[in-house]
Amino acid sequence: MKRRPRGPDIPLLGERLRLLEEEWRGRRLDSDPLELPHRYAAPADREVVAFLSASLAFGRVASIRSSAERLLDALGPSPADALARDAWDAPRLDGFVHRWVDSRSLRPFLRAVGATL
C-alpha cells in the first residue's frame, strides 16, 4: 500500500511567514516605489498612489521612483481628491517622460483614473 504524501503544515507555514515579515518589515522599503503609498494616511490616496506607481513600474527602480514622485508632486497632498476633482497641476507634468510614457499620454490617463473615483 502506497503512502500518501503529507500535506503542508499550514499553521507552521503561517508562523514562519509572520516571523519573516517581522524580520524584514521596512527594510529596503525606502528605495522601493512601494514606499510611496505609505506616505499617505487616507486609504483612497494610498490606493491611487499604489495604482499610479504600479502603472509606471517598468524600468529601473530608481527611474520608476523618480517618475512616480514627479507625478505625485503634480497631484499635491491628496492625489485621490485632486484626480476626482480634476484639480491637479497639469503644467507641472510638462516635459514628463518615463520610458515611452510622456505627458501627452499621461494626462488623459490621469483624467480617466479621476473619472473612476
Predicted regions span which residues?
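HhH-family (HhH-GPD) DNA N-glycosylase catalytic core used in base-excision repair
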Residues: 1-117
